[in-house]
Amino acid sequence: MTSVAVYWAPGCHLCEPVKATARAVCAELGVELREIDITGDDGLEAQYRASLPLVEIDGRRAFKYHLDEGEFRRRLARAGA
């Protein structure tokens, strides 16, 4: 089953629109979505802070900063969603 992870943090002005698009598309396609707040996790903050929001599809980085809905749908289709 295809899965999507969105890494985000409070105060990230780019994160909310990315999360909203990911939620809508994943709900429509029945794709598992995890929204991961990196706040307070030193390892995640070190790894992702400069790249927020970051979207992974099946554990692979797919989008950074912005989420193009059309390209997101195409990549999910290629992943089997």
Regions found by a protein language model. Name each.
Residues G59-A81:
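Non-catalytic, surface beta->alpha helical segment in thiol-disulfide oxidoreductase systems
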Residues E45:
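Chalcogenol-based redox active-site neighborhoods
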Residues V31-D42:
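Thiol-based oxidoreductase modules, predominantly thioredoxin-like and allied folds used
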Residues M1-S3, A24, E28, R73-A81:
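Short, low-complexity, intrinsically disordered N-terminal peptides in bacterial proteins
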Residues M1-A24:
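Local sequence-structure signature of Cys/Sec-based thiol-disulfide redox active-site neighborhoods
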Residues R49-V55:
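Structural micro-motif
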Residues A5, R34, A62:
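Short, flexible active-site loop motifs that bind/organize anionic cofactors or intermediates
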